Amino acid sequence: MKSFKKIVSDFTMKRLFWLVLGTAILSFGIHNIHQRAAITEGGVIGLVLLMNHWLGIPASIASPLLDFICYALAFKFLGLDFILTAAVASVSLAGFYRLWESFPPMLPDLTPWPLAAALLGGVFVGIGVGIIVRQGGSSGGDDALALVIRQLTGWKLARSYLFTDLVVLGASLSYIPARRIAFSLVTVTVSSLLIDWVQGLGYDEKIHGNDAAKEVE
């Protein structure tokens, strides 16, 4: 496993630029499309909502708890480099959320057209997260869990994302109407495929080693 000093020295401005760009795209899409059109999610976000509905656990407790579990697994299987890169991405993501919230909506309200919202939202999430993962980082517990699943199973990244999303969305049918879940399936399918495509651009298919995610030249 790399030392902390080595990891910091390898963290280039180019890598930082791409992490910032990825978090900007991701947060822009979630703020201007997902939140306005009320598109529900799979993965950790969906599990937080599920736990809140059936167990009464507040999101303020469930979300950090689930993220901690996912990142603990990521540290074990993906290493310190991944954790530090994910921390940079998380700070950048929070900053961009704050930035977008200070402006009025920048895209038309797609609430009357949920299919369009699901497709476009999936594009923003897929490209944004794909860029972040390509730099060896994570935007949240969802990405960390998907990368660990890929590490352990050898699945393609898209399949790992879809697996976690479909399990949670399937369980969410216990309290969310099927029509709403259907649009969520559209957005998670689009985003999963795009994450896999963007993350793999210019690279042969690889599995992350124990000490890091992918390194960018």
Question: Model regions: which residues?
Answer:
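Core subunits and conserved enzymes of cellular information-processing
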Residues: K2-E217
